[in-house]
A protein has these predicted regions:
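Short-chain dehydrogenase/reductase
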Residues: 105, 154-162, 196-200, 227, ...
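C-terminal substrate-binding subdomain of Rossmann-fold SDR/epimerase-dehydratase oxidoreductases
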Residues: 35, 209-340
């Protein structure tokens, strides 16, 4: 299917975004503001999400935040019944899945099944689902295309995402439920979780660099990732929703391989601390995949999607946001203390 067949319009649609107050979900909501949707409903249990992530969107458009859990069948029935399009972003982090595997199965597998059943029952037009490069494990094909098999994955998180992709294909065959799914590679940018227990390595590094300490690299620094800015990820989701394409999965990445050492050096440069050389620690075993590099040709060909934000520009924006956020939250803490 070619670009000339991209015909779907989100104008006037009622949209539901699960996990929509989180890192990626809130950026999807921001982009949806320009699509003239009738209503954008966000459900989030605020484990990873924050109301502040939606402040911009809620001030500009028809955005409604529901503080709830996707495991709440009664609530989800009400929300899905009123939706035309569903963006399914709710999930746990890969490290959280390791810590609480039972919860991971309930949130990431059972709740996805329940959601898809509701989408069929209430005639949802399209599901736009978040998947992950974790489904590949250590890919045998570099750059990795979407046809790479998922059998090298050795994480519960990746297994859950692969199973969810299978559910989407099955529901498309059995019930005609339209969907597109996106395998996110290494997403970064504003609104990364700086407050939670399972924070990203970039956040830890910024904290250390800002304090004049060297960033810690677990391993030898030669592991690679394919970093993609969260605003580009949001754009891919909107293009997928608006396209006439369904029953397809796409890599979302920039298509550039960056070592952890290169990332640390880029970050110290952006933060004005180039003299801080990274220090190395024993490698962790949560997700020991030595290489990540995506083929982005399928998304470019079928969706017209190409990541636009370079790593250096993206890191600069991330640092600016992080410093402003630290200043804002620090000021709020001081104000609260002064009033107590």
């Amino acid at each position: 299917m070619g670009l000339e067949e991209i015909v779907t319009d989100l104008k006037g649609k009622r949209v539901l975004v699960t996990g929509g107050a989180g890192f990626i979900g809130s950026h999807i909501v921001d982009v949806l503001l320009d699509e003239s949707c009738t209503e954008i409903v966000v459900i989030d249990n605020m484990v990873r999400g924050r109301p502040e992530n939606l402040a911009y969107a809620m001030a500009r458009g028809p955005v409604r935040l529901v503080n709830g859990d996707i495991r709440d069948t009664k609530l989800m029935t009400t929300l899905v019944k009123a939706a035309d399009v569903v963006f399914h972003q709710a999930a746990l982090r890969i490290t959280h899945c390791v810590a609480e595997p039972g919860l991971a199965m309930a949130v990431m597998v059972q709740s996805t099944f329940d959601l898809l059943e509701l989408c069929v029952k209430h005639n949802v037009e399209k599901v736009v689902a978040a998947s992950s490069a974790s489904v590949y494990g250590m890919a045998e094909e570099i750059p990795t295309t979407e046809s790479q098999h998922p059998y090298n994955n050795r994480t519960l998180y990746g297994a859950a995402k692969a199973f969810n992709e299978g559910l989407l294909r099955t529901f498309n065959d059995m019930y005609g439920l339209d969907y597109v799914a996106f395998r996110y590679f290494n997403v970064y940018g504003p609104r990364m979780d700086i407050h939670g227990r399972y924070t990203e390595v970039l956040i830890r590094w910024m904290e250390r660099i800002d304090a004049g300490q060297a960033p810690i690299i677990f391993g030898d620094g030669r592991h690679t990732m394919d970093f993609v800015h969260v605003q580009d990820v949001a754009l891919a989701n909107i293009l997928g929703a608006k396209s006439g394409i369904c029953d397809e999965v796409f890599n979302v990445a920039i298509g550039v391989e960056t070592t952890l050492l290169q990332l640390a050096q880029s970050l110290t440069k952006v933060m004005g601390r180039e003299s801080l050389d990274p220090v190395f620690a024993p490698e962790r075993s949560v997700n020991p995949v030595p290489r990540r590099l995506a083929s982005t040709s399928k998304a470019e060909k079928l969706l017209g999607f190409r990541a636009r934000i370079s790593l250096e520009d993206g890191l600069r924006g991330l640092v600016d946001w992080w410093r402003a956020e630290r200043h804002r939250t620090g000021a709020a803490v001081h104000a609260k203390a002064a009033g107590s």
